[in-house]
Amino acid sequence: MMVIPSGPIQDACCDYKSIESIQSDVFDKIQNLVKTKFFRHYRANLWKECPFWNEDALCTNRDCSVATIDEETLPLEWRKAALSAIQLPPTKGRLLMPSQQKCTYKDQDFCLVDDKLDSDHVVYIDLTENPERFTGYAGPSSARVWKAIYEENCFDIVHRMTEGCETCNNIMNLGDSSTKHRNPFAHVPKDKAELHQFLTDLAEESDGSNEDEVCLEKRVYYRLISGLHSSISIHICDEWFDQETGIWGPNLKCFVNRIGTHPERLQNVYFAYALLLRAVNKVGPYLEHYEFRTGSLKEDEKTSYLVQDLIKSTTSCPPTFDEKSMFRGSEAHVLRQEFKEHFRNVSQIMDCVGCEKCRLWGKLQTVGLGTALKVLFSYEDNSLNPITNPDLFERNEIVALFNTFNRFTESLNAIQRFRDIYLDQTSPKKEELLAENKSQSYIQPYVTKLFNQFKSWNIPLPNYIKLLI
């Protein structure tokens, strides 16, 4: 079968099979949760200026636009007038540069959340009405965003994280442009040799990383960024718009080109899922007594039940990631600060995305991963109590965390769907099987008669006849 990784997930505490099993168990639960009133409404500023370069390549495709909702229809506690106690001076639509952002985030934060910034320009969005999918946004604008992330905010380790893998290729194709990269899977694997090489790369123990050169913290950071990028690509391929038929649906060629040509990207989706799963599990006690304040007691109770039911499923398995293994030793403090600064920059770079809907989901999932990192690395287990520490997380952070977990859950589900499509395209056609069965049923009586005749003569049956039996 295509794309079935096996063995342990590098830098995590579980294997691929366990993650797929957990994903199957929680899929329906997280799907139901993100449709609730609390989790489907997200607050964002989609019109900040890009703080790093002049970005005017806005997508004009109607699929790029985001439909907002009237905030007057939402609970009072969620509205602009009910923001947290942090009051910020007006920024006139501009995002402050890092040197000016001393008051825009806490030291525990790994990213910038719109709730704390420029409250005059934020809007509410129903995420179920604005799904993440193919919009046609691509080209120089999109490439510039990812180039800035990988080249300037990834510890300069992209090359080393893909060394030693024959079919791997770093995301930006950096390096000597005169060297032609081997890319044997620009199409669906068509024979056992290609498929074997692909699966071998998936199972490679090191997947290109050199532990002597790249420390754990930097590897984890890179895997998260790559996993996010790969997950977004999977969503685009899974909900692809066929311009000829006018139908939305999965595009196998897109998936193979974006993910199948780079086995390490698939690995990193699983890794990011393992980290998110651990964060959701760890934040469970905090949400046990959390007040969702949807404006309806019945809705609050329903939301709380769905959250606890989901978290209960995550506690049924051993921890999938060990956060205590990170940021230890003499360089721990420096590494932690660099890690945060890089990830905060990534959250700002999402304001440079030229497609409104892509920007929305890029910002949300960056906040979601940032919240997961905050849960894992900023607080001990006994600190996660909403009664004694009620203001640890903004509402937006909780919404982003679970929606990001859902997006990665859907990515793993899409991988299974693409496997099935691949098998359907490469397996013998139904008509061929029927014709073969019909042919066999026609000659079988004659073969049986011949077999009995040879047996009565004590003559060994020829091999070519044995194959027909």
Model-based region annotation:
Residues M1-I469:
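Extended non-catalytic scaffold regions that mediate assembly and binding
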